């Protein structure tokens, strides 16, 4: 698993950035890449940090779209749009093979929630993985990654847990953050702009004989 937090700006070329942004939040249906011939659908979620686990979530509602699930594999044609992004991100880490465990996007609208009132600390799934977090647009609502690590026994934090800041990253179009999914993490709510991200959970298969070559 990766041993640091990596932030790369312009991980993909600007036309590719614009295509992703247009597809997810442009909404005019003018996409031209293969398998992208429909308007992008968003689905309401009652909490953007709730990964279908019971827990004391704060009710930060938003919209989501799943591309890949651990149970069913690829469930959205839009997944193909992000393969180049995944490939470029893995190249930065010199990872040659990955298994895509989970992939989704989230969209949240501006709120008046104070910046220090962050979303529920969480981790994405109960299995070793690393996180690829890509910012679709410029926004506020920083990503917060903590020093504390999970034992993969509960996907949500409780009131007795204490967290210390490891890294804070601001959303910027074309920026990607890569980190070990064992770290608890969360985000601030946006106050001034819509916040749109891609969140993929990947497993490094570089040292095994089977996997998806990228």
Residue spans of the language-model regions?
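Non-heme Fe(II)/2-oxoglutarate
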Residues: 1-97
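Catalytic core of non-heme Fe(II) oxygenases with the double-stranded beta-helix
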Residues: 79, 83, 87-214
